[in-house]
Design a protein with these regions (language model features):
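Conserved Rossmann-like nucleotide-cofactor binding loop
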Residues: 73
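Nucleotide/phosphate-binding catalytic cleft detector across ATP-hydrolyzing
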Residues: 1-70, 78-178
């Protein structure tokens, strides 16, 4: 038996999701980077299409399907029908901006400096657009006045206030799609 000297894992064919708003230059840079890293073949697919396929939405039918994909750096909004994208928009505001909004809110309202990982934990634990419960979350950070460690309790109301500017921008993007 002959043993293959080349493994298909050594030079894979890869599919990369890209934001709908990415420029041809950005797309080319992504492809070139993947090829330089050893990919045999590179194909790009827009993030909302990949999300719709993954969610099992009927994008090939004559009905409209809307996908809102909130990633780290971008929020992708797309309407698809009959196998194609009817409308798409990529907002440069998403999960990372939410983390930043929590960090800024804690600094402004509580004089508390928190790190990126703490801001992300707040988002995951108590982040909400509409306060429905009286949930609170203990946040540890550094007091900006004294420089000492400090812990404060924040509520869902704090979350609503912190996220409001980010969510307002996303809502406006969704309204544009409608």
């Amino acid at each position: 038996k002959k043993v293959h000297k080349r493994s298909s894992f050594a030079n894979p064919r890869i599919l990369i999701c890209v934001p709908t708003g990415s420029t041809p230059v950005e797309r080319k840079a992504i492809q070139d980077s993947a090829l330089a890293a050893g990919a045999r073949r590179v194909q790009l697919i827009e993030e909302p299409i990949a999300a719709a396929i993954g969610a099992g939405l009927p994008i090939s039918e004559a009905t409209g399907s809307m996908v809102i994909d909130i990633g780290g750096g971008t929020t992708e909004i797309a309407v698809m029908s009959l196998g194609g994208v009817v409308y798409s928009n990529s907002l440069r505001v998403a999960g990372d901006a939410m983390d930043g909004a929590f960090a800024n809110y804690m600094r402004k309202e509580y004089n508390l400096m928190i790190g990126d990982s703490t801001a992300e934990k707040i988002k995951k634990e108590i982040g909400t657009a509409i306060a429905t419960n009286n949930n609170t979350y203990a946040v540890k950070g550094r007091d900006l006045r004294s420089g000492t460690p400090k812990e404060v309790g924040i509520t869902e109301e704090d979350s609503v206030e912190a996220l409001n500017p980010i969510l307002r921008e996303m809502i406006n993007g969704i309204k544009d799609a409608l």
